[in-house]
Amino acid sequence: MDIITLAEVAGNLSVIGYGIGTLGPGIGLGILFGKAMESTARQPEMSGKIQTIMFIGLALVEVLALIGFVAALII
């Protein structure tokens, strides 16, 4: 195999790895928003606090996806 073919294979594998790596944050976001809606439906008076905590959790989960994206670009 020449160097160009190896570079293409490595690029394809990193994209596949990133695709698999985004499954966790995607599932995490779905659970996060679902539970936030459920909590707001149960206690509407706490919606402000629930929303604040939800946005903090959103940032933490999104960081995982961004780290996976950067790792895929580096490799």
Curated annotation (Swiss-Prot):
Pfam families: ATP-synt_C. The lineage of its organism: Bacteria, Bacillati, Actinomycetota, Actinomycetes, Bifidobacteriales. SUPFAM superfamilies: F1F0 ATP synthase subunit C. Its main location: membrane. NCBIfam families: ATP_synt_c. GO terms for cellular component: plasma membrane; proton-transporting ATP synthase complex; proton-transporting two-sector ATPase complex, proton-transporting domain. It is found in: Cell membrane. InterPro entries: ATP_synth_csu_bac/chlpt (IPR005953), ATP_synth_F0_csu (IPR000454), ATP_synth_F0_csu_DDCD_BS (IPR020537), ATP_synth_F0_csu_sf (IPR038662), ATPase_proteolipid_c-like_dom (IPR002379), F/V-ATP_Csub_sf (IPR035921). This is ATP synthase subunit c. F-type ATPases have 2 components, F(1) - the catalytic core - and F(0) - the membrane proton channel. F(1) has five subunits: alpha(3), beta(3), gamma(1), delta(1), epsilon(1). F(0) has three main subunits: a(1), b(2) and c(10-14). The alpha and beta chains form an alternating ring which encloses part of the gamma chain. F(1) is attached to F(0) by a central stalk formed by the gamma and epsilon chains, while a peripheral stalk is formed by the delta and b chains.
